[in-house]
Amino acid sequence: MERLENCAQMFQRRFLNESFRRHCPVLLACIVLGGSLLKELCPLPDSYWNNKRNVLNVYFVKFSWGWTLWLLLPFIALTNYKLTRSTTKVLRRLSSLLVSTLIWYLCTNLFLYIENITGSCYESEAMSDPKEHQDRRECRLHSGYWHGFDISGHCFLLSYCILLILEETSIISNIRFERHWHRMAINAQFAALSILVIIWVWMFLCTAVYFHNIFQKVIGTAFGILAWYITYRWWYLQPISPGLPPASASRSGKEPIYRN
């Protein structure tokens, strides 16, 4: 258990610290711009990481929202309850995950709609021999290749998940442990979320240097950062909202939601 605590403390000091949280949106913007320029000006040779069958893409990125939701839900519930001792306030904070899920659903469907209305169906990736299929789904059902404006869903979702986890884990520095099982459970969840952030940042970098064009990646990343900003930097500061994590509320100058 001591190793688990040391691991959580190491992640808190070196990765999920205040400086990284504050500069992460700028870092993500730099990664997507720098990676896109590298792809255009000096493409990297094929590697394991631009193979869509790589293990992180197959088992993590394809289910990135599920992983993020699955790990954040118990973490938010335990940490917020420990600070507030209020089931109502915990449920209020958990409603932020419903908001985030709605944002994920609307944005991904918007991206698919844009790709659908801007695309055409072809026999192959060389875009030869147009086929008479009117939407992406029908085209692929008939073994065609749909070419449209494909906003990077990976850039959107990975950037959004990274910023979401950083906001919600900021609460860790406010917690004082009284029971051993509290420390063990919360440290294990924090360590798992820290590892998830590292995976998301790495795969975001791989997307930037290997896939899509610069406009598709920049727009996807902009949606992710904007979704975070509108919720955590504006709406969640308002009285009628899921509210911020207690640590974030204190930093923003608002009254923390766990105070009576």
Swiss-Prot record:
The active site is at H154, H212. Its EC number is 3.6.1.-. It is a multi-pass membrane protein. It comes from the Eukaryota. One of its GO terms (biological process) is cytoskeleton organization. GO terms for cellular component: endoplasmic reticulum membrane. InterPro entries: FIT (IPR019388), FITM1/2 (IPR046401). It is found in: Endoplasmic reticulum membrane. GO terms for molecular function: coenzyme A diphosphatase activity; diacylglycerol binding; triglyceride binding. It holds the Pfam family FIT. It is an enzyme of class 3 (hydrolase). Its main location: endoplasmic reticulum. The chain crosses the membrane at residues 24-44, 58-78, 94-114, 146-166, 190-210, 211-231. Belongs to the FIT family. FIT2 subfamily. Fatty acyl-coenzyme A (CoA) diphosphatase that hydrolyzes fatty acyl-CoA to yield acyl-4'-phosphopantetheine and adenosine 3',5'-bisphosphate. Preferentially hydrolyzes unsaturated long-chain acyl-CoA substrates in the endoplasmic reticulum (ER) lumen. This catalytic activity is required for maintaining ER structure and for lipid droplets (LDs) biogenesis, which are lipid storage organelles involved in maintaining lipid and energy homeostasis. May directly bind to diacylglycerol (DAGs) and triacylglycerol, which is also important for LD biogenesis. This is Acyl-coenzyme A diphosphatase FITM2. It comes from Xenopus tropicalis. The gene is fitm2.
